Each structure stands twice: as C-alpha cells, then as structure tokens.
C-alpha cells in the first residue's frame, strides 16, 4: 500500500533504467549501473491488476512505474502502449507512472479511456544537466506533459527530487516561473503537484565516486543527517525552510494547483 497518488505500488514489466541519475535508488539495487531488465509475463500482471481493480468497491490507483521509467522502456518493448489500451477496458481503477522522458508520441493516439495518469518529473534544467544524465530536457518534458493532456490523459507534475545545491533557491524559482509561463491555463486547472526531497546514501556516494568522479557531490554534511541504515536526508530545519520557500513560490506563481503531498 502507498496512499500518496496511488493505493498500491506494484512491480510491473521492467526494473532498472538506462538513464544515470546520480541520486536514483535503482543504481544501488545493481551495485554500479542500473541496467534495464524486462519481464515477459505482462499478461499475468495486468490480469491481476484488473481483477483487483474490478473487485474493489471504489476506484483503486496502481503505481506501475516505481521500479523503472516505463516511457523509456516503451521505446524498446511497446509494453506501456499495450498496457494503456488494455487497462482502458477495465470497469474501475487507474494506472499511473512517473517519467523523466518526452517520447510520448506513441501514446497520444491510444484509446486510454481516462484510466491512465502520467506524472512528469521535473527539475531545473541545470540540475537535469548535472544530475539526471541521459534523460530528456525540461523543455521536452513540459512539451510532453502538454501533449498528453491534450490527448485526454490525466496528468500531474512531480517536483523530484528537490536537491539543495548552493543556488537552489534561484534554480527552483526559475523552474516554477517556467512552468507558470509555459503551461496552458486549462492544463493548470486539472493538474496536481507532488514534491519529494532527495534521499541519498553512502552506497550512492561510493558508486558515484567511482563511476562519475567529476560529477557534483550530493552529500553535504552541513545540510544532511543520518536516516535509517546508511541513508542521508536533509536536516529537519533545512528541509522546513525549503518546503516553505517552495510552497510560497507555488502559491505566487501557480496559485490554485493542489500540492497533494511533500515528503
């Protein structure tokens, strides 16, 4: 169970990702690089989802993209297209996935039945360039979000992960200004926002030091504290300041768009 955007996180047609985001937990699962692994029992998995959805007294939402970026996977397998069209036949429920990619063209003409929710993960372009190697640009992501909304999909924005680099206030101010300027009013009225702060770990540090020795260093002991086994998160006072700053920016620039959670 999840109870943020979705009711359940479910493993689906792939795990891993060929992008190289420096903070991603998938890298730790593979102990150096997060290669893409495909699963071939998609019919069994979707059948279980649809049976669970249709047995429920109300609509359930299933997060199918927590172990991979399904839009990237779709460029190889076509699994996301197949899933969207088949789940459209369900009498109840929704599927949802986040993405950092803009290759949505194959999804636009599909019969989705209003049962698929795409959440576009965004960050300031300098952070994308420095931390999210191999992913789409911010401009491309915003364009893809607009295209999916125009095709009738439910859409959301995931500001994630929030990374507190030296000039983070300026970077996130520019991000939210760009969203305010480029998103059409109709889309804004139907949008929701999620905010997730970065969690890091000593395993990330070791992997990144070897694989990307010249990359930006994400661990900052002046800002971070231990959390669980070998994990780091921003100190509560630092985190609270950043939350308030982001909420104020969103209120000023994107007033009325609900922020459904901050973690």
Describe these PLM feature segments.
Residues 12-21:
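Cysteine-centered iron-sulfur cluster-binding motifs in ferredoxin-type domains/subunits
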Residues 180-263:
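Auxiliary Fe-S-binding modules of radical SAM enzymes
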Residues 59-63, 94-96, 115-119, 154-158, ...:
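Structural preference for beta-strand elements that scaffold enzyme active sites
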Residues 73, 116, 133, 137, ...:
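Residues lining hydrophobic/aromatic ligand-binding pockets adjacent to catalytic sites
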Residues 68-71, 102-105, 116-135, 161-166, ...:
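Conserved radical SAM core fold
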Residues 141-204, 254:
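Conserved C-terminal portion of the radical SAM core fold
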Residues 1-7, 22-119, 147:
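Conserved Radical SAM active-site core
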Residues 42-48, 77-83, 135-144, 171-181, ...:
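Well-ordered, non-membrane alpha-helical segments in soluble/globular domains
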């Amino acid at each position: 169970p999840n109870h943020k955007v979705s009711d359940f996180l479910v493993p689906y047609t792939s795990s891993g990702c060929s992008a190289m985001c420096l903070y991603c937990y998938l890298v730790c699962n593979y102990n150096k690089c997060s290669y893409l692994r495909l699963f071939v029992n998609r019919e069994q998995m979707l059948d279980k989802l649809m049976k669970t959805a249709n047995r429920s007294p109300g609509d359930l939402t299933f997060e199918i993209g927590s172990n991979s970026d399904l839009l990237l996977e779709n460029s190889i397998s076509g699994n996301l297209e197949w899933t969207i069209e088949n789940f459209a036949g369900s009498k109840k429920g929704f599927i949802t996935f986040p993405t950092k990619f803009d290759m949505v063209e194959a999804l636009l003409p599909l019969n989705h039945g209003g049962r698929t929710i795409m959440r576009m993960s965004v960050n300031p372009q300098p952070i994308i360039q420095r931390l999210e190697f191999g992913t789409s640009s911010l401009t491309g992501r915003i364009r893809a979000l607009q295209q999916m909304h125009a095709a009738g999909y439910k859409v959301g924005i995931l500001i994630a992960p929030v990374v507190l680099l030296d000039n983070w206030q300026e970077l996130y101010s520019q991000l939210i200004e760009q969203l305010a300027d480029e998103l059409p009013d109709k889309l804004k009225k139907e949008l929701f926002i999620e905010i997730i702060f970065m969690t890091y770990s000593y395993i990330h540090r070791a992997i990144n030091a070897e694989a990307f020795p010249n990359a930006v260093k994400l661990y900052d002991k002046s800002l971070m504290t231990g959390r669980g086994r070998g994990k780091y998160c921003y100190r509560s006072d630092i985190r609270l300041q950043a939350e308030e700053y982001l909420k104020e920016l969103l209120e000023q620039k994107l007033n009325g768009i609900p922020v459904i959670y901050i973690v």
